[in-house]
UniProtKB/Swiss-Prot annotation:
This is Deoxyuridine 5'-triphosphate nucleotidohydrolase. GO terms for biological process: dUMP biosynthetic process; dUTP catabolic process. It comes from Mycobacterium ulcerans (strain Agy99). It catalyses: dUTP + H2O = dUMP + diphosphate + H(+). HAMAP family: dUTPase_bact (MF_00116). Keywords: Hydrolase, Magnesium, Metal-binding, Nucleotide metabolism.
Length: 154
């Protein structure tokens, strides 16, 4: 499998996705447009690039931690999933989580980061029950959403 990612620059006025530092897992994605996000509002923002994720891999679009902590800018469907067959422009659903202050995103601002990872493409097999399929019970069982505790004050 190649260690490269094919990128089409759809907007020649923007830089290609890039790593801020050597060894960073993600590459920064840039906004291709000016956007004003009022408090609590979201917008689908173009990045000006398309990528060809290799088969057996997935692209995951994550928020930039600095934007989330400093101004409350995040991604609605975090992480966003880019399947290997998608060839269109990458777009990011940004949301302003600040309760009072609008966020201004300028063309060329770094708005998200793209990570590309291997993914297991498992075959789905229908079973009537996990017991009948020979899948052992676990200590967790069907306990979800808060089943492990840890927040006595909430």
């Amino acid at each position: 499998m190649s260690n490269s990612l094919a990128v089409v620059r759809l907007d020649p006025g923007l830089p290609l996705p890039s790593r801020a530092h050597d060894g960073d897992a993600g590459v920064d994605l840039y906004s291709a447009e000016d956007v004003v996000l009022p408090p609590g509002q979201r917008a689908l923002v173009r990045t000006g690039v398309a990528v060809a994720i290799p088969f057996g891999m997935v692209g995951l679009v994550h928020p930039r931690s600095g934007l989330a902590s400093r101004v409350g800018l995040s991604i609605v469907n975090s992480p966003g999933t880019i399947d290997a067959g998608y060839r269109g422009e990458l777009k990011v659903v940004l949301i302003n989580l600040d309760p009072a202050t609008p966020i201004v995103v300028n063309r060329g601002d770094r708005i998200a980061q793209l990570l590309v990872q291997r993914v297991e493409l498992l075959e789905l097999v229908e079973v009537s029950s996990f017991d009948e399929a020979g899948l052992a019970a676990t200590s967790r069982g069907d306990g979800g959403h808060g089943s492990s505790g840890g927040h006595a004050s909430l």
